[in-house]
């Protein structure tokens, strides 16, 4: 007779699965035996007699009594009887026996109601488990039918009792081995420590924990996490839990802190970053904690980081992410010194220090560049106020279009410098909403400055080439200089996740970044930066260079052009006016990148000051021209070279 290959293959698969499942059941630490108890209509009782040891447990049933007796506990010794809720119209009850040897916990459930025969009594080292099935006695009318272990039916026949023989194992080690195989094994450890029926220290081979009780008088607590004996006490993390952690609606609640010196439960795939060895987990019993008013503080001890590396506080929320996913959301990194870093976090989960090599994302001489730019912006602020006053005073009584265009540029530069100074301050003291608003205003100031420089180029082009017979209305310039940037920023605000806190890390101290309110480092922000900022800057710089070339070509044959100071002032004044100094931003590479960066910060932060100097030079030349007795054209030609599009 021929065998069917498909049937043969299926049989082998079933046999293999049964073998694997059988092995898993035999080796599993916890025990669960269920069945249907057939009894009479008289009142029922649950009797139990439990003693310490590791021999056997017998589960039996008759007309009125369900009995649990044996020697399997580590510390629990209990013997008593419990009267069960009975229904005279029902002659059967479903029951389950749960045995957790690690906690020395034994619970019997009858018709959905739990009866705890042995309460949790610490975490047991050596315990009695691996309960293997022994003999069963048959019954005739009353007893247990459909007996099962962890869902697997033992027999459907009516039995009077079930006997299971136990064996000693190291429960803590086996529990840790099981946790290491689970995707979120740390949750298993945290749950076991949470169920630890006492306050204080809990020791496992894979983790150490402590249970802290918060009552109505809880005002915060500082403590050092428990650690293995072989670890130096001076290197153990310390934790501060604030009073805001306690729930007002609950009189008492437990905080569990778990400490892992071995990071195998938390490692992810290949990455350019690496976790430090210390992992700290924090949780509150039956609660999800987020957005704390006062943060929890975890201080880690470590060796000094390499010059090109930084350590930042990260957390893994195992309730949201099934796989290891370390994020810095909700955590601030505070550098205490070279060997201590403190994490301030507004939520509870697992925390660690992630060390990264960040050569490309750091800036050399950041403190010096920041100081230079801040001083330059402060000087430009004052210069813009003075220049705006001069322009208004000079043109009072006659609305000159050139003066109005200049005023627009002066106001834009003033806004840019003002918000640049404020952004570093507000990033450290203001909330997220204020920082987003400040970042958008700083971006508006930058775009408005670039647009007004483009308007200066366009206005000069109209005057030099005389494209139109009559000048364009001034509102067109103001619409493009102030309205167009407002439209762009409004669109970015509506998109969301564009503006916020930005951290710029100095190369000599990557753990102490400069905070500013600007465009964030997200993908959407980077896309907007390259399209809008870089795109507009490229247009302004290229058009400014072209216009500068055309103007210089037109005036280079004038008599006074040969005087060096006049030529220099002409080119420099127009360069600032047309925004061509921003071209230095495209030259930040190669061996002279640091020099270029310093020049970029110095020149562009002082742009308001240079424009004021340009205007002052024009006024002096105008006065000399007026006071000239012979009426020569020398002064006017100088003025024309500095300001080809301004008519006095």
From Swiss-Prot:
Any ranges marked Extracellular in the topology annotation, and which?
25-370, 430-443, 493-530, 587-595
Q: Which UniProt keywords apply?
A: Cell membrane, Disulfide bond, Glycoprotein, Membrane, Receptor, Signal, Transmembrane, Transmembrane helix
GO MF annotation, one: G protein-coupled receptor activity
Disruption phenotype annotation: Fishes are more active. Hypomyelination characterized by a reduction of mature oligodendrocyte number and myelinated axons.
Identify the residues that the record assigns to the GAIN-B domain, covering every copy.
214-361
In this protein, the residues bearing a glycan are 62, 91, 114, 146, 222, 262, 286, 431
Provide the topology term for how it sits in the membrane: Multi-pass membrane protein
Can you state the subunit structure given in the record? Heterodimer of 2 chains generated by proteolytic processing; the large extracellular N-terminal fragment (ADGRG1 NT) and the membrane-bound C-terminal fragment (ADGRG1-CT) predominantly remain associated and non-covalently linked.
Give the signal peptide as a residue range, or say none if absent: 1-24
One GO term of the biological process aspect: cell surface receptor signaling pathway
Q: What does this protein do?
A: Adhesion G-protein coupled receptor (aGPCR), which is involved in oligodendrocyte development and maintenance of peripheral myelin. Ligand binding causes a conformation change that triggers signaling via guanine nucleotide-binding proteins (G proteins) and modulates the activity of downstream effectors, such as RhoA pathway. Adgrg1 is coupled to G(12) and/or G(13) G proteins (gna12 and gna13, respectively) and mediates the activation Rho small GTPases. Adgrg1-dependent RhoA signaling promotes timely radial sorting of axons.
Share the domain note from the entry: The Stachel sequence (also named stalk) in the C-terminal part of the extracellular domain (ECD) functions as a tethered agonist. In the inactivated receptor, the Stachel sequence (also named stalk) is embedded in the GAIN-B domain, where it adopts a beta-strand conformation. On activation, the Stachel moves into the 7 transmembrane region and adopts a twisted hook-shaped configuration that forms contacts within the receptor, leading to coupling of a G-alpha protein, which activates signaling.
Q: Name a GO CC annotation attached to this entry.
A: plasma membrane
Compartment(s) where it occurs, according to its Swiss-Prot or TrEMBL record: Cell membrane
Cysteine disulfide partners in this protein: 34-96, 127-176, 313-343, 331-345
Cite the residue spans of the region called Stachel.
349-361
Similarity remark:
Belongs to the G-protein coupled receptor 2 family. LN-TM7 subfamily.
Q: How is its activity regulated?
A: Forms a heterodimer of 2 chains generated by proteolytic processing that remain associated through non-covalent interactions mediated by the GAIN-B domain. In the inactivated receptor, the Stachel sequence (also named stalk) is embedded in the GAIN-B domain, where it adopts a beta-strand conformation. On activation, the Stachel moves into the 7 transmembrane region and adopts a twisted hook-shaped configuration that forms contacts within the receptor, leading to coupling of a G-alpha protein, which activates signaling.
- Span-the-membrane segments of this chain are 371-391, 409-429, 444-464, 472-492, 531-551, 564-586, 596-618
Residue spans, topological domain Cytoplasmic: 392-408, 465-471, 552-563, 619-648
Question: Which parts of this chain are annotated as the region GPS?
Answer: 313-361
Q: Which domain of life is it from?
A: Eukaryota
**What PTM annotation applies here?**
Autoproteolytically cleaved into 2 fragments; the large extracellular N-terminal fragment (ADGRG1 NT) and the membrane-bound C-terminal fragment (ADGRG1 CT) predominantly remain associated and non-covalently linked.
Give the protein name, as stated in the record: Adhesion G-protein coupled receptor G1
Site-annotated residues for Cleavage: 348-349
